[in-house]
Amino acid sequence: MIAVIIAGGSGTRLWPLSTSTQPKQLLALTGERTMVQQAYDRARKLGDTIYVVTEASHAGALRAQLPELPDEAFLIEPGRRGTAHCIVLALDYINRHHDQTEPIAFIHSDHNVRDAQGFAHSFDTAARVSRECGCITLIGIEPTFPSTGFGYIQRDGVIDVQAGVYNVESFKEKPDYETAKQYVESGNYLWNCGYFVGSVDVFRNEMQRSAPDLWSNYQTLASIADFGSEAYNHAYLALDNQVIDIALIEKAHQLAMVSASFDWMDIGNFKDLHDA
């Protein structure tokens, strides 16, 4: 499995601790290693091939924090164009250099996860499910309280009860407290942590079916011979800003979801940091 660490966020909700020039993924908030270094440690449990997608202004700091990775492992956005296009950029690069059928795990650089073994187990399950169903497979977090700060995924129907694998019924935006309480009490909703697994082929097929605009943007980048060239960067900067959940995931014709077997926290504010 290939791991792609998404490391382009600004983390301004933790200002002044985290700033646009020194975002939270570059800080040691929950231990001796920084958030992105901890994400790298977890990514190593998934496989030997690891990429980091980031915006140009953070590339130098990330290279300094992850000296184990070669220069070509850093996939640089010339400017932020949203999570949808940073993932498209990664898919294009991986398609040029790897097997199109190899599963890819997209993970975030600023989440707090203590159970690295459980993390790896969940992603191994997601990779297996994605291969079997030919679909993008999400990781969902069983909610421990009625959070109003996270989106929710409604599960519908069991694919593999022993492995905790489900079909996806719907997505819910961040709810008010009473709605969140209903979600948790129903037992049918998981937190959407933004983790997903699928091969280049799986993502390309789903873009063609469900997100023609995103597919067109992928084709534009893939048609340029030199990845990262001036022409490539010019084309990338001409793209609009899109979030992957809205641009593709919520439109997908078929999805599966694995219930995570690890603890998780998105440190989005000072209360989350205190709880972590």
Residue map of PLM features:
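Conserved N-terminal catalytic core of the sugar/cofactor nucleotidyltransferase
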Residues: 1-5, 13-17, 23, 28-108, ...
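Solvent-exposed alpha-helices and their adjacent loops that cap or buttress functional pockets
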Residues: 6, 44-45, 97-99, 105-106, ...
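A short acidic, often aromatic-flanked loop/helix-cap motif at beta-alpha or helix-coil junctions
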Residues: 80-84, 145-147, 177-179, 264-265
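Basic phosphate/pyrophosphate-binding loop/patch that engages nucleotide-derived ligands
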Residues: 116-162
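Catalytic core of tubulin tyrosine ligase-like
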Residues: 152-276
